[in-house]
């Protein structure tokens, strides 16, 4: 006997401070809900396959990163136009302005408008006419 008393406590009160429960998101250092993403993964699986907790954490981290990236670029677009609210137009400008995000997000954004673009061949003709006068 070591004289330390009960080593393995049962259901009785412990002298140690009880640990408060922490969410999966807090443990992973994320803002997006890991538990909800895991639930969606399990629910949408074809053959009710098992989903590991690390898969849900990884997917949540990727979603959070992409969201932060798009919001940062859209915020910069809104700031350039001197407005304080991000609109679908700012999202469109941010996504289409970044080559990698443009390749990733092929969706049409409602009320996003179009990007201003004039073909270079047309610009050269206009400049030549101005030079001749």
From Swiss-Prot:
<dbReference type="GO" id="GO:0005634">
    <property type="term" value="C:nucleus"/>
</dbReference>
<dbReference type="InterPro" id="IPR009072">
    <property type="entry name" value="Histone-fold"/>
</dbReference>
<dbReference type="GO" id="GO:0042802">
    <property type="term" value="F:identical protein binding"/>
</dbReference>
<protein>
    <recommendedName>
        <fullName>Histone H2A.Z</fullName>
    </recommendedName>
</protein>
<comment type="function">
    <text>Variant histone H2A which can replace H2A in some nucleosomes. Nucleosomes wrap and compact DNA into chromatin, limiting DNA accessibility to the cellular machineries which require DNA as a template. Histones thereby play a central role in transcription regulation, DNA repair, DNA replication and chromosomal stability. DNA accessibility is regulated via a complex set of post-translational modifications of histones, also called histone code, and nucleosome remodeling.</text>
</comment>
<keyword id="KW-0238">DNA-binding</keyword>
<dbReference type="InterPro" id="IPR032454">
    <property type="entry name" value="Histone_H2A_C"/>
</dbReference>
<keyword id="KW-0156">Chromatin regulator</keyword>
<feature type="modified residue" description="N-acetylserine">
    <location>
        <position position="2"/>
    </location>
</feature>
<keyword id="KW-0007">Acetylation</keyword>
<keyword id="KW-0158">Chromosome</keyword>
<dbReference type="InterPro" id="IPR032458">
    <property type="entry name" value="Histone_H2A_CS"/>
</dbReference>
<keyword id="KW-0544">Nucleosome core</keyword>
<keyword id="KW-0539">Nucleus</keyword>
<feature type="modified residue" description="N6-acetyllysine">
    <location>
        <position position="4"/>
    </location>
</feature>
<dbReference type="InterPro" id="IPR002119">
    <property type="entry name" value="Histone_H2A"/>
</dbReference>
<feature type="compositionally biased region" description="Basic residues">
    <location>
        <begin position="1"/>
        <end position="11"/>
    </location>
</feature>
<dbReference type="InterPro" id="IPR007125">
    <property type="entry name" value="Histone_H2A/H2B/H3"/>
</dbReference>
<dbReference type="Pfam" id="PF00125">
    <property type="entry name" value="Histone"/>
</dbReference>
<dbReference type="GO" id="GO:0000786">
    <property type="term" value="C:nucleosome"/>
</dbReference>
<dbReference type="GO" id="GO:0006368">
    <property type="term" value="P:transcription elongation by RNA polymerase II"/>
</dbReference>
<dbReference type="GO" id="GO:0070481">
    <property type="term" value="P:nuclear-transcribed mRNA catabolic process, non-stop decay"/>
</dbReference>
<keyword id="KW-0804">Transcription</keyword>
<dbReference type="GO" id="GO:0006357">
    <property type="term" value="P:regulation of transcription by RNA polymerase II"/>
</dbReference>
<dbReference type="GO" id="GO:0140898">
    <property type="term" value="P:CENP-A eviction from euchromatin"/>
</dbReference>
<dbReference type="GO" id="GO:0046982">
    <property type="term" value="F:protein heterodimerization activity"/>
</dbReference>
<dbReference type="GO" id="GO:0031507">
    <property type="term" value="P:heterochromatin formation"/>
</dbReference>
<keyword id="KW-0010">Activator</keyword>
<dbReference type="GO" id="GO:0000978">
    <property type="term" value="F:RNA polymerase II cis-regulatory region sequence-specific DNA binding"/>
</dbReference>
<comment type="similarity">
    <text>Belongs to the histone H2A family.</text>
</comment>
<dbReference type="GO" id="GO:0030466">
    <property type="term" value="P:silent mating-type cassette heterochromatin formation"/>
</dbReference>
<feature type="region of interest" description="Disordered">
    <location>
        <begin position="1"/>
        <end position="30"/>
    </location>
</feature>
<feature type="modified residue" description="N6-acetyllysine">
    <location>
        <position position="13"/>
    </location>
</feature>
<comment type="subunit">
    <text>The nucleosome is a histone octamer containing two molecules each of H2A, H2B, H3 and H4 assembled in one H3-H4 heterotetramer and two H2A-H2B heterodimers. The octamer wraps approximately 147 bp of DNA. H2A or its variant H2A.Z forms a heterodimer with H2B. H2A.Z associates with the VPS72/SWC2 subunit of the SWR1 chromatin remodeling complex. Also interacts with RBP1/DNA-directed RNA polymerase II largest subunit.</text>
</comment>
<dbReference type="GO" id="GO:0000791">
    <property type="term" value="C:euchromatin"/>
</dbReference>
<feature type="modified residue" description="N6-acetyllysine">
    <location>
        <position position="11"/>
    </location>
</feature>
<dbReference type="GO" id="GO:0030527">
    <property type="term" value="F:structural constituent of chromatin"/>
</dbReference>
<keyword id="KW-0805">Transcription regulation</keyword>
<dbReference type="GO" id="GO:0031490">
    <property type="term" value="F:chromatin DNA binding"/>
</dbReference>
<dbReference type="Pfam" id="PF16211">
    <property type="entry name" value="Histone_H2A_C"/>
</dbReference>
């Amino acid at each position: 006997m070591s004289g330390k008393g009960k080593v393995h406590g049962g259901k009785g009160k412990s002298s140690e401070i009880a640990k408060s429960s922490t969410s999966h998101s807090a443990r992973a250092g994320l803002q997006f809900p890991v538990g909800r993403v895991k639930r969606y993964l399990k629910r949408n699986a074809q053959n009710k396959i098992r989903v590991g907790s690390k898969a849900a954490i990884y997917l949540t981290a990727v979603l959070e990163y992409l969201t932060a990236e798009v919001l940062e670029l859209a915020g910069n677009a809104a700031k350039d136009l001197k407005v304080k609210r991000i609109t679908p137009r700012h999202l469109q400008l941010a996504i289409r302005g970044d080559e990698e995000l443009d390749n990733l997000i092929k969706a049409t954004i409602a009320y996003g408008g179009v990007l201003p673009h004039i073909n270079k061949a047309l610009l050269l003709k206009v400049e030549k006419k101005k030079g001749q006068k």
